[in-house]
Amino acid sequence: MATVHYSRRPGTPPVTLTSSPSMDDVATPIPYLPTYAEAVADAPPPYRSRESLVFSPPLFPHVENGTTQQSYDCLDCAYDGIHRLQLAFLRIRKCCVPAFLILFGILTLTAVVVAIVAVFPEEPPNSTT
């Protein structure tokens, strides 16, 4: 029978589990696995929100209106650029979506008219003999 030493948290005494005779007869320690709450507490944030930005020491401080402004680091600059692109796409969508709907309506109406006209055969010109 195999004996497995299992410890849930560091510093707590291990629990000894005895397996069935069919398992290998080797003592195997199980690595420590944190609980969900411990894993969430230790996990780094997936991204930094604009409200929680912590500015790094300024590399090239500049002065605007008599106050020293700190420069953005690379992640802040990338976040700002992505945010500006998102705002630009939102502005374009507000203008272009109605225009495309109107264009789609006009093209659909034109296709319907062409289909109706194509159904009726052309009449031969009146020939007087």
Swiss-Prot record:
Q: Which UniProt keywords apply?
A: Host Golgi apparatus, Host membrane, Membrane, Transmembrane, Transmembrane helix
Which intervals of the chain are annotated as region Disordered?
1-25
Which spans are transmembrane here?
A: 100-120
Protein name in UniProt = Membrane protein 0
Asked whether the UniProt record includes Membrane among its keywords, one would answer: yes
Question: Where's it found, cell-wise?
Answer: Host Golgi apparatus membrane
The way it spans or sits in the membrane comes to: Single-pass membrane protein
Give the family, as the similarity comment puts it.
Answer: Belongs to the varicellovirus ORF0 protein family.
Q: Where is this motif: PPXY motif?
A: 44-47
List cystine links.
Answer: none
Q: Which domain of life is it from?
A: Viruses
Q: Name one GO cellular component term.
A: membrane
The record's subunit annotation is:
Interacts with host ITCH; this interaction probably mediates ITCH degradation.
UniProt comment concerning the protein's domains: Late-budding domains (L domains) are short sequence motifs essential for viral particle budding. They recruit proteins of the host ESCRT machinery (Endosomal Sorting Complex Required for Transport) or ESCRT-associated proteins. Contains one L domain: a PPXY motif which is involved in the interaction with ITCH, a member of the NEDD4 family.
